[in-house]
Amino acid sequence: MSGSTITPWVVGNWKMNPMRANANQLIEEFKQLLQQNQIADENCHVGVAPVSIALTTVQAQLQDAARTVHTVAQDVSRVAGTGAYTGEVSAELLKDSQINFVLVGHSERRDIFGDNVEILKAKLQNALNAGMTVIYCVGESLEQREQGQAEQVVLQQICDIAPVVTAEQWQNQVVIAYEPIWAIGTGKTASPQDAQAMHAKIREGLCQLTPAGSNIAILYGGSVKAENAVELAACPDINGALVGGASLKAASFYQIVQAFAQSK
């Protein structure tokens, strides 16, 4: 079942970038583009995910933008509430700072920092229970893809979290981001046809898990650029993009937002 009626999302994941002065300039340039060429909120949800120490600064800087731009945390603690957990930032602390969106399960968190299924389930559950919207990332490695395991791996990653997500949370608080790991930061990208095929399988799997399956946005996160955004946006089950490097340049990020806003 197609998700073509879903309002698309475009989220810029800045990762561990940039320095403060460059971040300020990036935000101001993006705001200028939004002012000159306004995109209605109802045509596309837009978010940026800066480093944790910049969340509230970026949020404040975006308040006078010509449209809503959400501030998204790149990660959240597996521990809820407050307490003696040095270096951690809980979902409750994020919400207390009016940060309502968070990435969970990004491949870099899984591969570099060892976020396994149990850790990710705890992070997801804490964020959802705190009232946050979670962009949950799934994806396969090149080896898994070459062995014909891509669909199985991705669908299992979604099934793994099902026990901690309620029907209401599926409906209102969950966005899925498919990121083929082999296409992140490599300049490679799945063809739009390949991306759509995987998104259609994810849609099918979501519909089997929850009645809300046909209404959940599924974002593509495999080296999305201004040059391929229009073609990706035309795919019926690609409901937006999780953008990495291209989100660090205001013009390219704006072009991606524009492509998805005009496509649905």
Swiss-Prot record:
Its EC number is 5.3.1.1. One of its GO terms (molecular function) is triose-phosphate isomerase activity. It catalyses: D-glyceraldehyde 3-phosphate = dihydroxyacetone phosphate. It comes from the Bacteria. Disulfide bonds: none annotated. It is found in: Cytoplasm. Substrate binds at N13, W14, K15, G185, S223, G244, G245. Pathway: Carbohydrate biosynthesis; gluconeogenesis; Carbohydrate degradation; glycolysis; D-glyceraldehyde 3-phosphate from glycerone phosphate: step 1/1. The active site is at H106 (electrophile), E179 (proton acceptor). Belongs to the triosephosphate isomerase family. Homodimer. This is Triosephosphate isomerase. It comes from Acinetobacter baumannii (strain AYE). The gene is tpiA.
